[in-house]
């Protein structure tokens, strides 16, 4: 059996590339971003070795079709000519030259392409509409005679690259856990030691720097197998997470005995936990530009996932609850770490320079938290609502309402029976007064136009041309 070396490692890579150029069943045209992505992947693969002619031709034809510059006509002519020559020249093996039309019939290539190639080479270039139509017909021919047969052929590749990655991740995770265990054991004994002194002053500083460098180096190492969908995005966070050990290192930090206590602990223990791990986080963040953004993003995903497991109809005040479950305790500490990192980044602390948090980001987080009723997002609101005065004023009625809901309790049937009609009226009057206050405040500071509420700025009248100090 003939074996050929190809630039993709797995059939899934080939299928992903095919999906960039062709929709399933060739129905419609893929979006422009997918076409560009396919061209980029082939360009990256070309650095690995020879690209099959049909794959390279597809890339050239697509590039010519999506080009908008003045040279599109010439680009289409060249790509069509190469498409025909690349198919027919390799089978021209006779001692005497065989007409191209005959060779074309042997591979079921319409003679239309041969005639068009002859016109491009020896006559005046055909018009742009003719070339565009020819390029599209060439792509259809390539789908029928190369891409679809290759995609549906039985794969003889028995090597499981996914399993290789999983074994690699297991080994890396064990290594990272050992390094974090070393740090935890030493830091608990030397909890007050300054870890940012010059390296030459203390031996423990040298050991600390060596441990940090080992973690950073490990995080930067590539996975054994990188999917085709992650080619040529070197400066992208998603690329770093999907193709290196960064995701493994970050996940190790979010386990028990690291950023989460080994057993259920009250939230008041957080300052002590922070004192243990903050120097290590700060040092890694200064040496790995993606570490802090990856940790921040993963924390948020974990918090949202845990919050979905809490019954939205039950409001828990964790400060008064006698015993927390493991999941509740973990969720609280993840929320505390997330709020701490966001506060540090929002206030511009130097060690968080790789993590950008704008007012829009802060507002988005607060809005999402306000839509949830779990105790973890309440922690985030309590920590972050005071960071920005403008946002605090904007959301204050919602903050107050949510706080009141958390202070309330779900009553059983017996407790409902004990409530008198007068008590219910008093409670209703209280809410009415609050609603009137909110409406009065809205009337004085907002106006409605075409269904939208606009906040009116409080600006004193002044003569035209006079500078108003804000």
UniProtKB/Swiss-Prot annotation:
<dbReference type="GO" id="GO:0006364">
    <property type="term" value="P:rRNA processing"/>
</dbReference>
<comment type="similarity">
    <text>Belongs to the LAS1 family.</text>
</comment>
<keyword id="KW-0539">Nucleus</keyword>
<protein>
    <recommendedName>
        <fullName>Pre-rRNA-processing protein las1</fullName>
    </recommendedName>
</protein>
<dbReference type="GO" id="GO:0000922">
    <property type="term" value="C:spindle pole"/>
</dbReference>
<keyword id="KW-0698">rRNA processing</keyword>
<keyword id="KW-0206">Cytoskeleton</keyword>
<dbReference type="GO" id="GO:0004519">
    <property type="term" value="F:endonuclease activity"/>
</dbReference>
<dbReference type="GO" id="GO:0000470">
    <property type="term" value="P:maturation of LSU-rRNA"/>
</dbReference>
<keyword id="KW-0963">Cytoplasm</keyword>
<dbReference type="GO" id="GO:0000792">
    <property type="term" value="C:heterochromatin"/>
</dbReference>
<keyword id="KW-0158">Chromosome</keyword>
<dbReference type="GO" id="GO:0090730">
    <property type="term" value="C:Las1 complex"/>
</dbReference>
<keyword id="KW-0804">Transcription</keyword>
<dbReference type="GO" id="GO:0005635">
    <property type="term" value="C:nuclear envelope"/>
</dbReference>
<keyword id="KW-0805">Transcription regulation</keyword>
<comment type="subunit">
    <text>Interacts with crb3, gcr3 and eix1.</text>
</comment>
<dbReference type="GO" id="GO:0000460">
    <property type="term" value="P:maturation of 5.8S rRNA"/>
</dbReference>
<dbReference type="GO" id="GO:0000448">
    <property type="term" value="P:cleavage in ITS2 between 5.8S rRNA and LSU-rRNA of tricistronic rRNA transcript (SSU-rRNA, 5.8S rRNA, LSU-rRNA)"/>
</dbReference>
<dbReference type="GO" id="GO:0120330">
    <property type="term" value="C:rixosome complex"/>
</dbReference>
<comment type="function">
    <text>Required for both pre-rRNA processing and heterochromatic gene silencing.</text>
</comment>
<dbReference type="InterPro" id="IPR007174">
    <property type="entry name" value="Las1"/>
</dbReference>
<dbReference type="Pfam" id="PF04031">
    <property type="entry name" value="Las1"/>
</dbReference>
<dbReference type="GO" id="GO:0005634">
    <property type="term" value="C:nucleus"/>
</dbReference>
């Amino acid at each position: 059996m003939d074996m050929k070396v190809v630039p993709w490692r797995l059939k899934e890579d080939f299928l992903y590339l095919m999906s960039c150029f062709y929709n399933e069943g060739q129905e419609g045209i893929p979006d422009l971003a997918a076409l560009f992505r396919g061209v980029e992947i082939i360009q990256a693969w070309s650095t690995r070795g020879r690209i099959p002619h049909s794959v390279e031709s597809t890339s050239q034809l697509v590039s010519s079709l999506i080009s908008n510059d003045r040279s599109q006509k010439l680009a289409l002519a060249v790509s069509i000519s190469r498409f025909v020559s690349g198919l027919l020249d390799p089978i021209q093996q006779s001692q005497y030259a065989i007409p191209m039309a005959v060779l074309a019939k042997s591979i079921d290539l319409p003679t239309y392409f041969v005639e068009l190639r002859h016109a491009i080479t020896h006559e005046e270039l055909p018009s742009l509409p003719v070339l565009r139509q020819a390029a599209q017909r060439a792509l259809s021919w390539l789908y029928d005679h190369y891409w679809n047969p290759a995609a549906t052929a039985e794969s003889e590749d028995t090597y499981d690259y996914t399993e290789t990655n999983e074994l690699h991740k297991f080994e890396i995770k064990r290594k990272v856990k050992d390094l974090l265990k070393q740090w935890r054991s030493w830091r608990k004994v030397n909890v007050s030691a300054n870890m940012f002194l010059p390296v030459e002053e203390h031996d423990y500083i040298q050991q600390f720097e060596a441990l940090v460098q080992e973690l950073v180096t490990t995080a930067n190492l590539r996975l054994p197998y990188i999917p085709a969908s992650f080619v040529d995005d070197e400066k992208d966070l998603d690329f770093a997470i999907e193709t290196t050990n960064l995701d493994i290192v970050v996940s190790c930090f979010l386990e028990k005995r690291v950023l989460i206590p080994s057993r259920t602990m009250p939230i008041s223990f957080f300052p002590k936990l922070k004192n243990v791990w903050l120097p290590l986080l700060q040092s890694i963040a200064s040496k790995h530009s993606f570490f802090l953004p990856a940790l921040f993003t993963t924390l948020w995903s974990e918090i949202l996932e845990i919050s979905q497991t809490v019954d939205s109809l039950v409001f828990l005040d964790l400060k008064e609850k006698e015993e927390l479950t493991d999941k509740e305790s973990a969720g609280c500490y993840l929320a505390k770490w997330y709020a701490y990192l966001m506060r540090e980044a929002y206030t511009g602390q130097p060690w968080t320079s790789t993590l950008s948090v704008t007012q829009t980001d802060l507002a988005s987080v607060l809005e999402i938290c306000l839509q949830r009723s779990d105790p973890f997002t309440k922690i985030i609101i309590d920590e972050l609502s005071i960071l920005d005065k403008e946002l605090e004023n904007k959301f204050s009625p919602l903050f107050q309402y949510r706080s009141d809901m958390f202070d309330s309790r779900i009553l059983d049937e017996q407790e409902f029976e004990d409530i008198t009609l007068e008590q219910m009226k008093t409670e209703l009057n209280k809410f009415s007064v609050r609603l009137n206050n909110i409406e009065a405040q809205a009337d004085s500071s907002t106006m409605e136009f075409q269904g939208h509420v606009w906040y009116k700025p409080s600006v004193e009248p002044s003569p035209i041309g006079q500078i108003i100090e804000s």
